[in-house]
Amino acid sequence: MADRLPTSTSSGRRRRDGDASIGEFVIGGEIGKGSFAQVYSGHHKNSKAAVAIKSVEMGRLNNKLRENLYGEIQILKTLRHPHIVALHDCVESATHINLVMEYCELGDLSFFIKKRDRHGTNAATEDMARKYPVTPGSGLHEVVTRHFLQQLASALKFLREKNYVHRDVKPQNLLLLPSPGFRKENSRPILTASNDSLIPNAGLASLPMLKLADFGFARVLPSTSLADTLCGSPLYMAPEILRYERYDAKADLWSVGTVLYEMITGRPPFRARNHVELLRKIEATEDKVKYPKDAVVSKDLVKLIGKLLTRNPVERMRFEDFFNDPVVVGPIPGVVEDDIPKVEQKPSRDLRSLEADPQREQSELAKSPRERPLRSPQLPSPDEVRVPQANVSARTGQSPGREIGEGLGIRRPPMPQPSTSAPSRPHRLSNASLNRPPIRASASPPTSYLNERKLRPVTERSMTEQDKAAQDVAFERDYVVVEKKHVEVNAFADEMAANPRLTSLSPKNGQMVRRATQQGPPTSTTGAGRMQPSSAVQIAQGKGRPGHDHPCVSLASRSLNTSSAARAPLRPCTTRSPRIRHRHPLLLLDSSVTADRAHHLTKMHGSSSSSKTSHIVVIVYMALPKSSLSNFSLWHLPWITPWVAPLPTKSMRMVLLSRQRWLCLRRLSCFTSRL
């Protein structure tokens, strides 16, 4: 065991003759003295790292103080925080207990405040004094005050998370170290308890670092518990302690308020010769803290100090509010540019992964734009982007998918050929449409499209067949006139009547596969997918599958031939379909019209019809099973889709056509099966 530590006088002689040692540490000169202990500087024998050694004489302690000392040792062993003085080792002898702790070169906050006018003469504080000079008649600069407050709050928050109450927060127990930058270049190495022990957790890295010390009166005290021990320094005691009342952890907040007041003004808020006089002065203020005339204090600090120095602990600021106060967590105003914390730009996750895997980067670059992952760039608002239709048509005629997809980093399928007879108006690009995930475009509601997508797969066809069908669809565009709510279709029935191949189609395999198209006009720049020709269009254009009969179509053709309307003889359809002289509008009715009412209108108009231009209500979904009613709409007519896409879909249930076209649709099984 080590012998009794020397006094300051003998320590000087010991340094000349050979320093005393305690375990692995060498004792130096005295740097502080308290009621029951002396504090010496020291260093580690091997690393020469500086330490502070607190030597307590056991003979001067009563049982209560001895219990407090052992309690302090147990608490310090469990605490590891950048703003709490760490305990390295504890060496006990017959007469002394020696606590080896972190070394704080600048002393305590009380000394720092008293010597504030001489900060410019100390190399460790010279830069701080130049940037944040002290105002005459006031305390520390507000930037320095807020800096120390944030670090003290960080330490107290750590204690509250462990249900500790310090009970002796005062400037004498707040120790200071030079800033990390100064220590790195000038100071001798300091023995640390952890890797981040000397890295500030709050405040500014360019200013001195604060650490909370002296846990002799600390104890475990949950937020719902009370204590009744009279302890701490009277000038910084909470009034409930001075009144010998039971108190909770909020007593530390009162002490924080007194320390904050002393930092900003240079003196304690209340001074007296004894406890009674001190309590009387506190009661006399009635929670209205007075400041010296020369003190420079911001409104935020005045407000915070008022909340902390509230006599009634119930009305006093809570710890949660204190830790979230803008003064504690917010940026410090008035900081010089050199001290503003630099925000490190960290690479994104994708960039880090590509840097770690060069092969993946090469593979990503090798991918085509269609295969690359979707990224959403920052795009202007919809009002800022207007694309004239003429320009869109010119681009989409070349390679719209590649041009738009590569230019904006968006994966797009090939777009359909634009219509030359579509309404000539500009279309806007929106962030929503450009940032939309790469899916098959659908002009119907999303829910309906998802349900149908699960029920049937989309048939893949070769590009040659797609091009031919797209040309045929382009021929049909010439016979469609778009008016707000009326769409006129003329070519479909004539193609059926004029094409003899329709008689060889099978009713079992004849089905119309719903094609996914993007909502919007045919020249929309939102990246609608290229429409593959549907079965119905192929049937209409004479592209049915050979070897399959379709008696319904044959019946429709015969009914067309026997109708009162004069018809051209059946002939192969090798070119574009003939123009129809009479226009028969396709009317979209509201879904509120019942099936019975529509059937009645069908009979009424059918019996009174004597001309080709008479209109008959056709309920397209009458021949469908109930399970298909919610999914069927005019979107199943692929040549209509580009023209009715901007219209609401829920009202598209009933169609007004001439009798001939109604018979064709009614008898064409591809509209009534496996939709």
Curated annotation (Swiss-Prot):
An example GO biological process term is: response to starvation
Q: Which domain of life is it from?
A: Eukaryota
PANTHER family this protein is in? NON-SPECIFIC SERINE_THREONINE PROTEIN KINASE, SERINE/THREONINE-PROTEIN KINASE UNC-51-RELATED
Basic and acidic residues bias: where? Answer: 339-374
Domain (Protein kinase) spans 25-328
GO MF term (any one): ATP binding
The subunit structure is:
Homodimer. Forms a ternary complex with ATG13 and ATG17.
Polar residues bias (residue ranges): 390-399, 516-538, 556-565
The record places the active site at 168
Instruction: Name the Enzyme Commission number(s) assigned to this protein.
Output: 2.7.11.1
What the record says about family reads:
Belongs to the protein kinase superfamily. Ser/Thr protein kinase family. APG1/unc-51/ULK1 subfamily.
Which chemical reaction does it catalyze?
A: L-seryl-[protein] + ATP = O-phospho-L-seryl-[protein] + ADP + H(+); L-threonyl-[protein] + ATP = O-phospho-L-threonyl-[protein] + ADP + H(+)
Alphabetic keyword roster: ATP-binding, Autophagy, Cytoplasm, Kinase, Membrane, Nucleotide-binding, Protein transport, Serine/threonine-protein kinase, Transferase, Transport
Subcellular location, record wording: Cytoplasm; Preautophagosomal structure membrane
This entry carries the following GO cellular component terms, namely:
autophagosome; cytosol; phagophore assembly site membrane
The annotated region (Disordered) lies at: 339-455, 501-577
Q: Which SUPFAM superfamilies match?
A: Protein kinase-like (PK-like) (SSF56112)
The record, for Gene3D superfamilies, names: Transferase(Phosphotransferase) domain 1
Where ATP binds, per the record, is at 31-39, 54
Keyword check for Kinase, yes or no.
Answer: yes
Q: What does the record say about its membrane topology?
A: Peripheral membrane protein
Cited function: Serine/threonine protein kinase involved in the cytoplasm to vacuole transport (Cvt) and found to be essential in autophagy, where it is required for the formation of autophagosomes. Involved in the clearance of protein aggregates which cannot be efficiently cleared by the proteasome. Required for selective autophagic degradation of the nucleus (nucleophagy) as well as for mitophagy which contributes to regulate mitochondrial quantity and quality by eliminating the mitochondria to a basal level to fulfill cellular energy requirements and preventing excess ROS production.
> What is the gene called?
ATG1
Know the name of this protein? Serine/threonine-protein kinase ATG1
